[in-house]
Design a protein with these regions (language model features):
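Short, membrane-interfacial amphipathic segments enriched in basic
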Residues: 1, 389-404
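Membrane transport/envelope proteins' first extracytoplasmic loop
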Residues: 1-264, 273, 444-458, 549, ...
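Hydrophobic alpha-helical transmembrane segments of multi-pass inner-membrane transport and secretion
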Residues: 8-37, 243-283, 301-318, 349-357, ...
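Juxtamembrane segments of multi-pass membrane proteins
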Residues: 55, 401-530, 534-538, 549, ...
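Short coil/turn motifs that cap or connect alpha-helices
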Residues: 146, 291-292, 374, 546, ...
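Short helix-loop junctions at transmembrane helix boundaries
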Residues: 312-350, 698-767
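Short cytosolic juxtamembrane segments of multi-pass membrane proteins
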Residues: 372-389, 759-771
Length: 771
């Protein structure tokens, strides 16, 4: 009976199968990439032994004081000093081409002895011989650096060539969001380089007992140990590594859950329509002795079989999808070893089983609800027609008969269109959400979520002992450059802030004129007076500070009270920054960063190239390029998701339209036959069906667009809230969002309506009379 029923209703059964299969594919794929990401990142971190805490420092320091501190604190399990030789990008070449266009800061390092190892592509500790170099995987992918290529370091009359012998994975600095990259060379080579160019920077790296990071930060600051740089926790490193892949996992899982919900709605609709159509048959079965329980099992079996087959195929397809989307994860982090394959195959099975349980329980509830009628009611074939309502025909006749009848029937039978309406909302939402996310990330104004106002160029001055002199030289040039509309110079340094526990933490501060490139603040405004400070969203949250409250800073052994003037969004430096008018001592500065706006007619790329030739000690980056390099991986991922969601959404719209039309035509065959008997042609009836579906679709697209533009912003903000941006304003491409996407959705549905509605030709009044 089940097999015959599936054969009889091939299209409807196939559509339900497709819904369940697609949701199983996405659920399985999302779980698989999630497992792959977590296990690969954890495996890389374990083999590399990333530090629990890192304190960066430039300049001389007291080695004995550091050693004594380590000896006197039992929670420190291991300690080492990693020396990094910072090299200007203009002094670094790949196959003759300078790195000066790269946003990344580059440092040469030798392999560490105790922990924080740089690994090769087999996730083994990389060994580099003299004259060779290990290049980060980031440069392999972004700049096309390959094994055997030449990397040249050149300054003045000094030059040295290295052969790329290894592509390395750096558990600390793999992510594009980490703006520094380490290049691995031999110990002898780094000593030679240091005597000719570059500047040393030190990383004080700690392995700690669990839960000791807060104690270390407090004790380290209290001991007044070297801290001319940022402090980074291992958890922040892990968060940066998981950010880009975490977004795609969240999106895939969300789509999968929504698809299961839509499949459940379709299932409900199909079961109710089937039971209504076979009401008299069910009545006969009950009359001859079948119990409700037996009938329920019989009808439930069909949908369980469909769900099982869809789940198996979806599981296999989802694993292929997961492996495809996991390629970049494996490339950057490697494959985890051990029993990971069992976990990667096992956890998606649990997801598919959950889907099967949802379908089974849903079938039981829906069928039970529809078997409440008495045997007499079922034998009579009584249905819910009386609940559909009615509409009046116009007294003076039809002006547009097809439109009048279509909207009249839509008014009476709106309940049967709820499922397709929800699917159209979902499809529109699904198309627009990733598209709007990608547009927002790629737009120059996304800079505001990185803690600075929108600008054309970013200029960095760092890695030099005469930082102030370089800044003055840059300022003199900018003042005399007729192409520049405005610029602002910002100091970046660190101070200490009093936290809620009465202890001192490090805080990174930007000091400069905030009015030149203003931000949109979540709350309050930019600091104007010398006693005002603005906090990033995560800093305000962690310090539990609101607008108007006091905050105590300690700089150069002086405690100063500030008033919180504003709270802004920032996803850089782990989302923990601040802005204040604090004059840093030159030796305490990390960098000067200058933001520049050019006059409208000036070509940004051309001007950037010109400034690089003049300002040889500075790093000049167009803001679009800055965003592309920092968030390029995320943007590429969103591009893949955007294409996939368009295809899935159109497929869903076509499937659900086909299914609903088939069910409506079967249910309304009497009405169709009567209309044809009184003079309506097949084309008239097809037009009436098309008007109903397209009216529902246009309304659904409108609602979906509103939700994507509003609720979608909240979703994106929720994704980024852990990184420092809680409230995102979508930057929408109106042509794509409001013309192209709705147009292609309407066209796809129009085509399927045209094809499926041809079935009205088989309904005739003579057949209804015979029946």
């Amino acid at each position: 009976m089940v097999v015959n029923d599936i054969r009889k209703n091939r299209i409807i059964s196939s559509i339900l199968f497709a819904f369940l299969m697609i949701s199983a594919v996405l659920l399985t794929g999302g779980l698989r990439i999630g497992v792959t990401s977590i296990t690969s990142i954890n495996a890389l971190s374990t083999v590399a032994q990333i530090p629990d805490y890192i304190q960066m420092h430039k300049g001389a320091y007291d080695e004995k004081a550091i050693d004594d501190f380590v000896k006197n604190h039992d929670y420190i399990e291991a300690f080492q000093v990693t020396k990094m030789l910072n090299i200007k990008n203009s002094e670094l070449y790949h196959n003759g081409k300078s790195f000066e266009n790269s946003l990344m800061d580059n440092s040469f390092v030798a392999q560490n002895e105790s922990f924080d190892y740089l690994l090769d592509m087999n996730n083994e500790i990389a060994i580099i011989d003299k004259g060779e170099i290990g290049i980060p995987i980031y440069y392999s992918q972004e700049l096309g650096v390959e094994l055997g290529d030449s990397i040249r370091v050149e300054k003045g009359s000094y030059a040295k060539d290295f052969k790329v012998s290894t592509i390395i994975r750096d558990a600390q600095m793999n992510s594009a969001l980490t703006s520094s990259k380490r290049l691995l060379i031999n110990e002898a080579d780094i000593l030679e380089l240091s005597s000719n160019l570059g500047e040393w920077e030190y990383c004080f790296e700690f392995l700690l007992e669990e839960g000791s990071i807060a104690s270390l930060e407090t004790d380290y600051i209290g001991a007044k140990l070297p801290s001319n740089g940022v402090g980074i926790s291992g958890s922040l490193i892990t968060m940066l590594n998981t950010f880009s892949h975490g977004i795609i996992i969240i999106i895939i899982m969300a789509i999968s859950m929504l698809l299961i919900g839509i499949a459940f709605l379709c299932l409900s609709y199909i079961i109710r329509a089937t039971l209504a159509e076979q009401s008299s048959i069910i009545g006969e079965m009950r009359a001859i002795g079948f119990t409700k329980k037996e009938i329920k099992k019989l009808y439930q079996l069909k949908y369980v079989i469909i769900a099982i087959v869809a789940g198996i195929i979806g599981y296999l397809g989802g694993n292929l999808l997961g492996d495809y989307l996991s390629e970049s994860v494996i490339l950057y982090y490697g494959r985890a070893k051990g029993n990971i394959e069992l976990i990667k195959w096992g956890i998606p099975v649990i997801g598919v089983l959950i889907q099967l349980v949802i379908v089974t329980i849903g079938c039981t509830v829906i069928i039970s609800r529809n078997l409440r009628k008495t045997v007499l009611q079922m034998l009579k074939g009584e249905d819910d027609v009386k609940r559909e309502g009615h509409y009046k025909l116009p007294a003076n006749g039809f002006k547009y008969p097809n439109i009048s009848i279509a909207f009249g029937e839509l008014k009476c039978k709106y309940r049967q269109y709820i499922v397709v309406f929800l699917v159209f909302i979902f499809s529109s939402f699904l198309i627009l959400l990733p598209m709007n996310m990608k547009n927002t990330i790629n737009h120059p104004s996304f800079m505001s979520y990185m803690g600075v106002g929108e600008s054309d160029l970013r200029i960095d001055i760092q890695y030099t002992g005469d930082l102030e002199a370089k800044k003055e030289l840059l300022e003199a040039h900018l003042n005399n450059d007729a192409d520049i509309e405005k610029y602002a110079i910002y100091q970046y340094g660190s101070a200490q802030v009093l936290n809620n526990d009465g202890k001192w933490d490090n805080i990174r501060i930007e000091s400069g004129n905030q009015a030149k490139f203003p931000l949109d603040y979540l709350e309050g405004k930019a600091p104007v007076n010398d006693n005002e400070i603005a906090l990033s969203y995560l800093n305000a949250k962690e310090l539990n500070k609101n607008i108007g409250e006091n905050l105590t800073l300690n700089y150069m052994n002086k405690e100063v009270e500030f008033i919180v003037s504003g709270i802004y969004q920032d996803i850089t430096y782990g989302g923990k920054t601040a802005k204040a008018k604090l004059e840093f001592n030159e030796k305490d500065l990390d960098a000067y960063i200058v933001y520049v706006n050019l006059k409208e007619e000036i070509d940004i790329e051309k001007k950037a190239s010109e400034l690089r030739e003049i300002l040889t000690d500075s790093k000049v980056t167009p803001v679009r390029e800055f965003i592309a390099q920092t968030l390029g991986g995320i943007s590429d991922t969103m591009g893949i998701v955007e294409v996939a969601t368009v295809i899935i959404s159109l497929f869903l719209s076509v499937l659900i339209t086909a299914m609903i039309l088939k069910l409506i035509m079967a249910k309304e065959q009497n009405a169709i036959a009567i209309k044809k008997a009184i003079g309506f042609s097949n084309d008239d009836l097809r037009i009436q069906l098309g008007i109903r579906i397209l009216a529902i679709q246009i309304f659904g697209i409108g609602v979906g667009t509103i939700l994507a533009n509003n609720f979608g912003e909240a979703i994106f903000g929720l994704m980024l809230s852990g990184f420092g941006a809680s409230k995102i304003k979508f930057l929408i491409n109106p042509i794509k969002a409001y013309l192209f996407c709705p147009g292609i959705q309407i066209l796809a549905v129009l085509i399927i309506v045209t094809v499926i509605s041809k079935g009205v030709s088989k309904y005739h009044i003579r057949n209804q009379i015979i029946e």
